[in-house]
Amino acid sequence: MSDSMDYASSGVDIDLEGAAVASLIGSLQRSTRKPGTPGAPVDLPGGFGGLIEFGSHLLAMATDGVGSKLQIATAVKQWGSVGIDCMAMNVNDLLCVGAEPIAFVDYIAVPKPDPEVHAAVGASLAKACELANVTLAGGETASLPGIVTELDLSGTAL
């Protein structure tokens, strides 16, 4: 067994991911608003946050999830940091484009609701909002038996 700690050794094909994202973006470009109109994208190289025109200002948004770290949280049954991690990934993406995060929405998908787990994730998200000085403006909780096998958490920051 290899001691390598990279995407390929974990089963992730970065080249295939890149091709899939390029295909997705290529399909979406036809629906993009035109420059000079509210909501039109602003191209800023190197950023993970999306920028759009918003009158005389720019609005920045970022979406990210906790990813494979949720497998660790599930294995050790510790949820106290997953909301903070989710917020941090999103806030960091906005800071990278020079934006100040002001609001956040979350998306939690589970195979079956668990009030104790939901309370712990909620407490973690509340702490994350406090740390980032961001308002939790809403979110979605989806019970998806047969579609997801363990909790998934993602969010969008504005």
Report the location of each language-model feature.
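Glycine-rich phosphate/pyrophosphate-binding loop regions near the starts of catalytic domains
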Residues: 23-158
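N-terminal amphipathic/basic leader segments beginning at the initiator methionine
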Residues: 2-35
